[in-house]
């Protein structure tokens, strides 16, 4: 990175954070520092940043909220405090996958707005800016007291996989919440056919069902777009409906892939032919999931972000 100020990449805890920090360091031309992480006998987290970092005026901490998310959160807070203690003036959290964002409001009485509490904690710990890749709802970044960046990955992912949007392609949001993603992807790729499915979720049991649809998939190759695949239930439901209603095939784009339990088996049984996701969470061996390196995309946008801090 050009300029008089010196920035450093600080790798976070976990395999996804390690991979992403190495990619950012390579793409941004910045030094990478790898802290020491360990647990005390009572399982309290401990971190130490080795080496002299006092000469750096800024740091980009790469910490994805991989499981358990609470551990990722605590390590991100401890790293920020360690950097402040070392005299680093400006600190950016690059969270490839930002946790706690799905509890963005009170669904049942007595619940917290979890993402608000987390954003406040991160800002209080010393972070001046926060960047992530396709957060669940972009407005949750407003809870963070500082500069924010939400990186849209889907156009880049399609390009990297060599898939184009032809006349027989339809882009589908598995629920109305993902419609803005689909609209933007359609706009940037020139895809004229898109829409969304309407799902209903039982807040107690978590059971999901499709209520209706705004798309006609007959004779189309469907691209389903969502921010995250967790248990695979939503994607499986969408794929099954699309194929039953005449779609030729179902291809999935997801920014993040947790793949909990039998998610892959569930999607395969529902007819999903391929899933393309980002390297924001730990990679899993898979028959249908392909990972796209998003560090090149993130590097360019982070360079602009830090230049304005």
From Swiss-Prot:
SMART domains: Pribosyltran_N (SM01400). D-ribose 5-phosphate binds at residues 201, 226, 230-234. ATP binds at residues 42-44, 102-103. Pathway: Metabolic intermediate biosynthesis; 5-phospho-alpha-D-ribose 1-diphosphate biosynthesis; 5-phospho-alpha-D-ribose 1-diphosphate from D-ribose 5-phosphate (route I): step 1/1. It catalyses: D-ribose 5-phosphate + ATP = 5-phospho-alpha-D-ribose 1-diphosphate + AMP + H(+). InterPro entries: Pribosyltran_N, PRibTrfase_dom, PRTase-like, Rib-P_diPkinase, Rib-P_diPkinase_arc. It is an enzyme of class 2 (transferase). Its cofactor is Mg(2+). The keyword Nuclease does not apply. Mg(2+) 2 binds at residue 175. The keyword Transmembrane does not apply. Its EC number is 2.7.6.1. Gene3D superfamilies: 3.40.50.2020. Keywords: ATP-binding, Cytoplasm, Kinase, Magnesium, Metal-binding, Nucleotide biosynthesis, Nucleotide-binding, Transferase. GO terms for cellular component: cytoplasm; ribose phosphate diphosphokinase complex. It is found in: Cytoplasm. Belongs to the ribose-phosphate pyrophosphokinase family. Class III (archaeal) subfamily. NCBIfam families: ribP_PPkin. This is Ribose-phosphate pyrophosphokinase. It comes from Aeropyrum pernix (strain ATCC 700893 / DSM 11879 / JCM 9820 / NBRC 100138 / K1).
């Amino acid at each position: 990175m050009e300029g008089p100020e010196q920035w450093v990449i600080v790798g976070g805890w976990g395999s996804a954070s390690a991979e992403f920090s190495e990619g950012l360091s390579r793409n941004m031309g910045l030094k990478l520092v790898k802290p020491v992480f360990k647990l005390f006998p009572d399982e309290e987290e401990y971190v130490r940043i080795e080496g002299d970092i006092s000469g750096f005026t800024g740091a980009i901490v790469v910490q994805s909220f991989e499981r358990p998310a609470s551990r990722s959160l605590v390590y991100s807070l401890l790293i920020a405090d360690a950097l402040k203690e070392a005299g680093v003036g400006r600190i950016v959290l690059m969270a490839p996958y930002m946790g706690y964002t799905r509890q963005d409001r009170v669904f049942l009485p007595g619940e917290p707005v979890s993402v608000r509490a987390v954003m406040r904690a991160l800002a209080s710990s010393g972070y001046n800016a926060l960047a992530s890749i396709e957060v669940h709802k972009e407005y949750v970044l407003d809870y963070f007291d500082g500069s924010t960046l939400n990186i849209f990955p889907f156009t880049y992912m399609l390009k990297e996989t060599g898939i184009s949007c032809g006349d027989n392609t339809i882009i589908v949001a598995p629920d109305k919440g993902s419609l803005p993603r689909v609209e933007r992807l359609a706009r940037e790729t020139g895809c004229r056919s898109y829409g969304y499915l309407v799902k209903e979720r039982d807040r107690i049991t978590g059971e999901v069902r499709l209520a209706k649809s705004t798309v006609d998939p007959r004779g189309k190759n469907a691209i389903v777009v969502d921010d995250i695949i967790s248990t695979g239930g939503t994607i499986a439901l969408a794929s099954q409906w699309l194929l039953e209603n005449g779609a030729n095939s179902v291809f999935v784009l997801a920014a993040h892939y947790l793949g909990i339990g039998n998610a892959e088996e569930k999607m395969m049984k529902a007819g999903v032919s391929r899933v393309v996701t980002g390297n924001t969470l730990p990679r899993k061996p898979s028959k249908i999931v392909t990972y796209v390196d998003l560090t090149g995309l993130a590097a360019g946008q982070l360079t602009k972000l830090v230049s304005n801090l």
